Amino acid sequence: MKARLLVLLCALAATDADTICIGYHANNSTDTVDTVLEKNVTVTHSVNLLEDSHNGKLCRLKGIAPLQLGKCNIAGWILGNPECESLLSERSWSYIVETPNSENGTCYPGDFIDYEELREQLSSVSSFERFEIFSKESSWPKHTTGGVTAACSHAGKSSFYRNLLWLTEKDGSYPNLNNSYVNKKGKEVLVLWGVHHPSNIKDQQTLYQKENAYVSVVSSNYNRRFTPEIAERPKVRGQAGRINYYWTLLKPGDTIMFEANGNLIAPWYAFALSRGFGSGIITSNASMHECDTKCQTPQGAINSSLPFQNIHPVTIGECPKYVRSTKLRMVTGLRNIPSIQSRGLFGAIAGFIEGGWTGMIDGWYGYHHQNEQGSGYAADQKSTQNAINGITNKVNSVIEKMNTQFTAVGKEFNNLEKRMENLNKKVDDGFLDIWTYNAELLVLLENERTLDFHDSNVKNLYEKVKNQLRNNAKEIGNGCFEFYHKCNNECMESVKNGTYDYPKYSEESKLNREKIDGVKLESMGVYQILAIYSTAASSLVLLVSLGAISFWMCSNGSLQCRICI
């Protein structure tokens, strides 16, 4: 019996066998990603797809400065409000900047017809040529061209728009006028004019020498006849009269004709337009700085190659797509679950089931071995590189497909188009929700696939080792194998590179397996003997105890015993 127990203890003491484990990289990263099934999964590596920062500045766009309207708005600039005179020299720009509270627009009160459409047209213009369409000195010889008003005062004196002429009577007469212009600029020409509506007949007769007047404007695409509406109105900027402002785009080679017998606010300067990709109009209080950018928002410039941003829906230039997301992070590495580096009964290192290895820094997947010569980590470079190439190509493909750089400007609606504006906002919100949903779903799905891909690669590496070793080693859990033979560093390297010589070690493994199996049988015999002795001893103790209790109870009369023959 003693000999058998000694054999068992010796066998248990001699099982410090060589081992090899398959596992994956872990590090101290705190990056988290979301997948379809999980949230906030900690991973070793990831890339951010969502830009959420800007510099708070207005910058040059591709080296070209914006047109800052300052205290003027589009109307004041394009009509030539005297307070916007400094803008008359501007010829080109990358984008146009209005401030939210610009005060200088139409100085003489009235309606700017189709103003929102004009803003939309100008948002795609990157430069223009301002030229005299009708000469102030020679085009209207029978009319006075110096009409001014206190509503458009400048430097304390009455003045008028720098791009329009207020034609009035001359020497007590206002003869019919008829003038035309042929567009020979080779590009679209923006022409502006106005129609004056006095507040009373007296002003009408004083200015135009007649009570009934008309204005006619005709081109190949435009044909309107205007009749002044004479009526008392509340004073605005000290004026009871009104001027309605009009515009049209004249195509190359087209002719525009003006005919009137009063009340015409005639064109003086017009604009030959040059359209450019990426221009636009933004409303911003940000200040201009010495900086360059490829993407400008009202909040500030964005310098990013990421496919998405959540800064502002209005963008100028080559900009990421706006989404409402707060996080779009795509995993490129593995689940980051560093294992507790503890030694077990056989000195095994926790493998890929329990967690990754922070000690393996030169690859994503690899091995940890232990033998008489020592222990160490080694990455499987081939599987790691294949995974890196595949994931890099996938990330680049996703970014390329989603990274459609473009300008997104707000649409213009006037006060009478609120229903249309509200409908447009709902449609835009719907598209924005779809874009946001698609972006988030894409990232969730790709993250799930990437993590599954890594799990599959680790499993494939495990199966590769298992298929080589076959019954020359046994699986001991945690991604580890215990050899039935001695495996030095050369042997370990052959397992890692796939050249393990199974027949070379099969005989030694067979003998060691038989020894271990024999020890198991011997130990089974020992356990059976111990079990029999234990059962017999327990039964004997129980019988003696029962006899003693019975004798005591009989002696004090608690139990009566009768023997019948």
From Swiss-Prot:
Coiled-coil annotated spans: none
Lipidation, S-palmitoyl cysteine type: C554, C561, C564
Top-level taxon of the source organism: Viruses
Extracellular side stretches: 18-528
Transmembrane portions of the chain: 529-549
Topological type in the membrane: Single-pass type I membrane protein
Keywords from the UniProt entry: Clathrin- and caveolin-independent endocytosis of virus by host, Clathrin-mediated endocytosis of virus by host, Disulfide bond, Fusion of virus membrane with host endosomal membrane, Fusion of virus membrane with host membrane, Glycoprotein, Hemagglutinin, Host cell membrane, Host membrane, Host-virus interaction, Lipoprotein, Membrane, Palmitate, Signal, Transmembrane, Transmembrane helix, Viral attachment to host cell, Viral envelope protein, Viral penetration into host cytoplasm, Virion, Virus endocytosis by host, Virus entry into host cell
Gene Ontology molecular-function annotations: host cell surface receptor binding
Signal sequence, renumbered to the chain: 1-17
InterPro entries named in the record: Capsid_hemagglutn, Hemagglutn_HA1_a/b_dom_sf, Hemagglutn_influenz_A, Hemagglutn_influenz_A/B
Any one biological process term the GO annotation gives: fusion of virus membrane with host endosome membrane
Cystine pairings recorded for this chain: C21-C480, C59-C291, C72-C84, C107-C152, C295-C319, C487-C491
Residues under site feature: Cleavage: R343, G344
Post-translational modification: Palmitoylated.
Positions on the Cytoplasmic side per record topology: 550-565
Intracellular or extracellular location(s): Virion membrane; Host apical cell membrane
Miscellaneous: Major glycoprotein, comprises over 80% of the envelope proteins present in virus particle.
Stated role: Binds to sialic acid-containing receptors on the cell surface, bringing about the attachment of the virus particle to the cell. This attachment induces virion internalization either through clathrin-dependent endocytosis or through clathrin- and caveolin-independent pathway. Plays a major role in the determination of host range restriction and virulence. Class I viral fusion protein. Responsible for penetration of the virus into the cell cytoplasm by mediating the fusion of the membrane of the endocytosed virus particle with the endosomal membrane.
Subunit details: Homotrimer of disulfide-linked HA1-HA2. Interacts with human CACNA1C.
Protein name per Swiss-Prot or TrEMBL: Hemagglutinin
Protein species of origin: Influenza A virus (strain A/USA:Iowa/1943 H1N1)
Gene this protein is translated from: HA
